[in-house]
């Protein structure tokens, strides 16, 4: 049973001190979280980390059945999304189950992904030279797109986690669950080219650790550091639309499904505890099929 505790109080303190929310707004957030906690207890969900996208959909259905106004539902979703964004920031969770629920219409919001032309532009950036940090960025991009792992998981890769004989990486994911994720020849070649340069860089700065990815001083690259590196790659590629690093994970899943991979396999590769978290990508592939049909069929 979930009871109000430290996490909620930290969130409410955050609303007051950092967001400068009024007392009335903060009270509304508290009531929304209280109602959601009641729902979770009824569903025998004992931690906020266990909540999946499917649980969110069930909760939305319940709100609809109770005839809440669209405005009220939108506010509740906004409150809970903010709470889960806070949990994400505090590294309590790895994914926000409210991400794909829109504010106004409570409709499914499809994950954004890179188109093939955009991926080509990104790879051109990391293959433009063989400088140490460019080689590092090449590994970063090849591994993230080639495995679909989260940015935080990528930051945690250690050299002993690499099994080159089986072309697989040991990943420590959500809830410290471990899984092996395969990687392809492009990622393998990128890692092979990078490791000697990594060793030289670490020797120059007298560093000693097992982190695969390092910064310009030879220290382990953090999650924030990876996001910064990816942002620089994206900027150099001159991509114009609003994008974020997590889209590489979305692109990995979407490309697999578009090319015939089964849902269960994609679920395992992504490290999703529930199949419902993976099913969001079937909507993306349907949109892809429709757009392809509309573009190429003479009677569309």
UniProtKB/Swiss-Prot annotation:
Residues 109-294 form the Tyr recombinase domain. Residues 2-88 form the Core-binding (CB) domain. It is found in: Cytoplasm. InterPro entries: CB, DNA_brk_join_enz, Integrase-like_cat_sf, Integrase_catalytic, Integrase_recombinase_N, Integrase_SAM-like_N, Recomb_XerC, Tyrosine_recombinase_XerC/XerD. GO terms for cellular component: cytoplasm. The keyword Cell cycle applies. It holds the Pfam family Phage_int_SAM_1. The active site is at residues 150, 174, 246, 249, 272, 281. CDD domains: INT_XerDC_C. NCBIfam families: PRK00283.1 (NF001399), recomb_XerC (TIGR02224). Forms a cyclic heterotetrameric complex composed of two molecules of XerC and two molecules of XerD. PANTHER family: PHAGE INTEGRASE-RELATED, TYROSINE RECOMBINASE XERC. This is Tyrosine recombinase XerC. It comes from Listeria monocytogenes serotype 4b (strain CLIP80459). The gene is xerC.
């Amino acid at each position: 049973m979930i009871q109000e505790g430290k996490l909620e109080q930290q969130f409410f303190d955050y609303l007051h001190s950092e967001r400068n929310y009024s007392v009335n707004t903060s009270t509304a957030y508290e009531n929304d979280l209280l109602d959601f906690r009641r729902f979770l207890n009824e569903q025998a969900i004992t931690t906020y980390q266990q909540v999946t996208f499917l649980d969110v959909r069930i909760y939305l259905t319940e709100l609809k059945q109770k005839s809440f106004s669209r405005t009220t539902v939108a506010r509740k979703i906004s409150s809970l999304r903010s709470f889960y964004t806070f949990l994400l920031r505090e590294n309590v969770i790895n994914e926000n189950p409210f991400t794909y629920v829109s504010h106004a219409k409570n409709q499914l919001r499809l994950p954004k992904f890179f188109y093939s032309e955009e991926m080509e532009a990104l790879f051109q950036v990391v293959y433009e030279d063989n400088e140490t940090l460019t080689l590092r960025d090449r590994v970063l991009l090849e591994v993230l797109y080639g495995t679909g792992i989260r940015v935080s998981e990528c930051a945690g890769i250690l050299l002993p986690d690499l099994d080159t004989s089986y072309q697989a990486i040991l990943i420590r994911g959500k809830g410290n669950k471990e899984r092996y994720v395969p990687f392809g020849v492009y990622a393998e070649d990128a890692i092979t080219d990078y490791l000697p340069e990594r060793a030289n860089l670490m020797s120059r700065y007298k560093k000693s650790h097992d982190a695969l990815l390092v910064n310009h001083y030879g220290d382990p690259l953090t999650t924030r550091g990876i996001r910064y590196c990816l942002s620089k790659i994206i900027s150099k590629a001159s991509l114009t639309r609003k994008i974020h690093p997590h889209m590489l994970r979305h692109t990995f899943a979407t490309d697999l499904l578009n090319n015939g991979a089964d849902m269960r396999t994609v679920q395992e590769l992504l490290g999703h505890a529930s199949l419902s978290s993976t099913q969001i990508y079937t909507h993306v592939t349907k949109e892809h099929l429709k757009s392809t049909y509309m573009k190429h069929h003479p009677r569309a």
